[in-house]
Amino acid sequence: MNIIDNFEQENIAKLTANKKIPDFEAGDTVKVTVKIIDKAIEKDGKEKLTERFQAYEGVVIAKRNRGITSSFLVRKISHGEGVERRFMTYSPIVHSIDVVKYGVVRRAKLYYLRHRNGKAARIREKLISRAKPKTAIS
């Protein structure tokens, strides 16, 4: 490994020390919680910074794995309009990433979903079977 790779690995380890990033792919539905900092002006004229969390849930249509600059693109339908938002995977602004359901697709980039709406934009859900406990045969 060269110096740049070592530097990236150290920074990724620091950024992921207090949060868990799940394994997800294109086609999975994720819920990304993002930290938002608002400025509010108080009555005496001072600025006050308030911090809140906002959830963004949608289908991952692209994932870009590039070390510390890795990102993923999430698409959702909001009030009848398609909205896409790109999140940096290791950004401190991203508070948490939760996988809501896993999808079955045959492509790495699902840009074709931009031109589909309604039932045509559905993605099959991956059914995860629960392991049955093995019983001893006597």
Swiss-Prot record:
UniProt-listed InterPro entries: Ribosomal_bL19, Ribosomal_bL19_CS, Ribosomal_bL19_sf, Translation_prot_SH3-like_sf
Alphabetically ordered keywords of this record: Ribonucleoprotein, Ribosomal protein
Any one cellular-component term (Gene Ontology): cytosolic large ribosomal subunit
Secretion signal, residue range per the UniProt entry: none
Taxonomic superkingdom: Bacteria
A Pfam family: Ribosomal_L19
Gene3D superfamilies cross-referenced by the UniProt entry: 2.30.30.790
GO biological processes: translation
Gene Ontology MF terms in the entry: structural constituent of ribosome
Similarity comment: family membership: Belongs to the bacterial ribosomal protein bL19 family.
Function: This protein is located at the 30S-50S ribosomal subunit interface and may play a role in the structure and function of the aminoacyl-tRNA binding site.
UniProt name for this protein: Large ribosomal subunit protein bL19
Native species: Rickettsia prowazekii (strain Madrid E)
Protein's gene: rplS
